[in-house]
Amino acid sequence: MTRGFAPILPVEFHKMGSFRRPRPRFMSSPVLSDLPRFQAARQALQLSSSSAWNSVQTAVINVFKGGGLQSNELYALNENIRRLLKSELGSFITDYFQNQLLAKGLFFVEEKIKLCEGENRIEVLAEVWDHFFTETLPTLQAIFYPVQGQELTIRQISLLGFRDLVLLKVKLGDLLLLAQSKLPSSIVQMLLILQSVHEPTGPSESYLQLEELVKQVVSPFLGISGDRSFSGPTYTLARRHSRVRPKVTVLNYASPITAVSRPLNEMVLTPLTEQEGEAYLEKCGSVRRHTVANAHSDIQLLAMATMMHSGLGEEASSENKCLLLPPSFPPPHRQCSSEPNITDNPDGLEEGARGSQEGSELNCASLS
């Protein structure tokens, strides 16, 4: 051993690990290295959605052409639509069906009807409607069954499309005048069913045109007239054949009676709407309905009618007798009241009637 030199001993140095931990897979913030994987998954999802929608589109067009669904095809179509509802195309399914698929399918129906002329067109239209209402419409409802809770259902959209794209384009009004004697029952059914479908925005110009057609085949007819002088639609009763009725002459009291006119939009109730799904329950609160708050006026009107009929029945033998009602009779309408205004003492009402009859000269309503 040499003096002054220390022995050289081997020393092992352990390398410390990196402080950066591996990124967990469940973290939401992606990194640049994950971008190709995300793009591949997005492309696969788009291809799957495109394939699913192509299958739905092909099936719908085939139904309009008169074909049917294959075995287990309806289940596959429903699953494809459920998958589409969860994708980016979910909110556009109803709009695309209404503006693209339905218009394309009804185009074939319209061309089939326009090939015929005269009274043959009515017969072809009746056959087309029977097939559409019994075969095409139920199949469309079954295919788009997962699409629920929309503003308009698939059934309503299809019927409105048939009205606008088929019925109103074949100019049925002139043909109805020629075929009144042998009009097929399917035409009357078609007009009444299409009239029962209402747009959520109120009566449109197409709806008023449809009512003009219904008026030619249905009597009596209660519908909406297209008078533009009012702020809203007016309800009119139209008859094709007049009936003889007893003439009623109405004579007023000596005191003038002022008629109070109310805006039309306050008197006309909104039409009933057909809804499906959970959205109908959410909209129930906005539907205008009759309540028991107006029961007092109905009871008073019923009592008045009973008194008038009883008076006319007892005094039918005399010619110049009529029912007299005192001007002091309480008004039939009271606001902010939940109980009917019924007189506690009916004898007082009779005494008031006799006193007013003796004291003043009154006119009455006489039937001739």
Swiss-Prot record:
Where on the tree of life does the source sit, at the highest rank? Eukaryota
* Keyword presence, Cell cycle: no
Q: Where is this region: Disordered?
A: 327-368
Bias (Polar residues) occurs at 335-344, 357-368
Secretion signal span: none
Instruction: Provide the protein name.
Output: Proline-rich protein 5-like
UniProt cross-references to Pfam families, sorted A to Z: HbrB
Give one GO biological process term: positive regulation of mRNA catabolic process
A GO term, aspect molecular function:
ubiquitin protein ligase binding
Answer whether the UniProt record assigns the keyword Ubl conjugation to this protein: yes
Q: Which residues carry this modification: Phosphoserine?
A: 28
Q: Which family does it belong to?
A: Belongs to the PROTOR family.
What's the PTM story here? Ubiquitinated. Ubiquitination by RFFL promotes proteasomal degradation of PRR5L thereby modifying the substrate-specific activity of the mTORC2 complex. Ubiquitination by RFFL is stimulated by LPA/lysophosphatidic acid.
| Purpose of the protein | Associates with the mTORC2 complex that regulates cellular processes including survival and organization of the cytoskeleton. Regulates the activity of the mTORC2 complex in a substrate-specific manner preventing for instance the specific phosphorylation of PKCs and thereby controlling cell migration. Plays a role in the stimulation of ZFP36-mediated mRNA decay of several ZFP36-associated mRNAs, such as TNF-alpha and GM-CSF, in response to stress. Required for ZFP36 localization to cytoplasmic stress granule (SG) and P-body (PB) in response to stress.
Q: Which UniProt keywords apply?
A: Phosphoprotein, Signal transduction inhibitor, Ubl conjugation
Which species is this UniProt entry from?
Homo sapiens
Describe the subunit structure: Interacts with the mammalian target of rapamycin complex 2 (mTORC2) which contains MTOR, MLST8, PRR5, RICTOR, MAPKAP1 and DEPTOR. Interacts with RFFL. Interacts (via C-terminus) with ZFP36 (via C-terminus); this interaction may accelerate ZFP36-mediated mRNA decay during stress. Interacts with RICTOR.
